[in-house]
Curated annotation (Swiss-Prot):
This is Beta-ketoacyl-[acyl-carrier-protein] synthase III. It catalyses: malonyl-[ACP] + acetyl-CoA + H(+) = 3-oxobutanoyl-[ACP] + CO2 + CoA. Homodimer. Belongs to the thiolase-like superfamily. FabH family. The keyword Lipid biosynthesis applies. GO terms for cellular component: cytoplasm. Gene3D superfamilies: 3.40.47.10.
Length: 317
């Protein structure tokens, strides 16, 4: 038994900040940002627009897309690095917004790899027979973690949420396989310099960009090769490749190493920037809305995030 995605939805806050606007208060310019990242703009949530609020909007779109009653959902998993509160979880707040009394809900924190981790967890829970319909969300207000004077990081991130409905599959569609990994020895490559038990603050993002670029390509490449090999697939079998939308140079280098044709690679980083755990479900929602996906298509997800955490998932639509 496996599970399949029966609906998806994405939400981006209405406020858009272009590179030119960013250059008014940061020592940067549009050419510098585009050349190094491929990003032209990012969406930024308002001061009173929290992660749970943007998660709800993405969830409602996924529920509508799946054409199910909200009461069919029997578990909620929210992948996030930027919760509203230290506790309770975003997922339980979302459960309350949706009126799903007693439905178990929890947050999963694997930073930018969170959605891939969430896919594996949700698939395992549905495959066990314990749950039938899971709402899985990646939602982030990454701009709350930015030092707006650090041009190496503040140009990279945006806010947004993406959501999917996963349900038991009775045919050959659904999650084929996935893998997840972590390496705590590399945590200083990307982290925040704050935390509840450290100094009582959320901190700001600290990143070693060159090291992260190299490891991102290396780790995702290894993860994908292993996943394809273990399931007797080749790159030629892939119809759409949806990598984490962190940086177009990482995406292009990974696609080059894998020899994936460019028209199969989904790229939303230019307009979305890096939305961490929301980036893959947002990209999936964008692809689905384009009408290009057809039943039977093979889709590959891959992501890497702080931790380090990384992994990939293979599914048949």
């Amino acid at each position: 038994m496996t599970c399949k995605i029966i609906g998806c939805g994405g939400y981006l806050p209405p406020k858009v900040v272009s590179n030119d606007e960013l250059a008014k208060f940061v020592d940067t310019n549009d050419e510098w940002i585009r050349t190094r990242t491929g990003i032209s703009q990012r969406h930024i949530a308002g001061d009173t627009e929290y992660t749970s609020h943007i998660a709800l909007k993405a969830a409602e779109k996924a529920i509508a897309d799946a054409d199910i009653s909200v009461n069919e959902i029997d578990l909620i998993i929210t992948c996030t690095t930027t919760p509203d509160n230290s506790f309770p979880s975003v997922a339980t707040k979302l459960q309350g917004y949706l009126g799903l009394n007693n439905v178990p809900s929890f947050d999963l924190q694997a930073v930018c790899a969170g959605f891939v981790y969430g896919v594996q967890v949700a698939n395992s829970l549905i495959s066990s027979g314990k749950y039938k319909t899971i709402l899985l969300i990646g939602a982030e207000k990454m701009t709350s973690l930015l030092d707006w004077e650090d041009r190496a990081t503040c140009v990279l991130f945006g806010d947004g949420a993406g959501s999917v409905i996963l349900q038991r599959s009775d045919d050959n569609s659904g999650i084929i396989d996935s893998n997840i990994f972590s390496s705590g020895a590399d945590y200083e490559i990307l982290y925040t310099n704050g935390g509840v038990s450290m100094n009582g603050s959320s901190g700001k993002i600290i990143m070693q960009g060159q090291k992260l670029f190299r490891l991102a390509v290396e780790k995702m490449h290894q993860s994908i090769e292993e996943l394809l090999r273990n399931n007797n697939f080749t790159v030629n079998d892939i119809d759409y490749f949806i990598p984490h939308q962190a940086n177009v140079r990482i995406i292009n280098k990974l696609a080059e190493l894998l020899n994936v044709e460019d028209h199969k690679v989904v790229k939303t980083v230019e307009k979305h920037a890096n939305c961490s755990s929301a980036s893959i479900p947002l990209a999936l929602s964008t692809l689905k809305a384009s009408g290009k996906i057809k039943k039977g298509d093979i889709i590959l997800f891959s992501a890497i995030g702080a931790g380090l955490t990384w992994g990939s998932a293979l599914l048949r639509w």
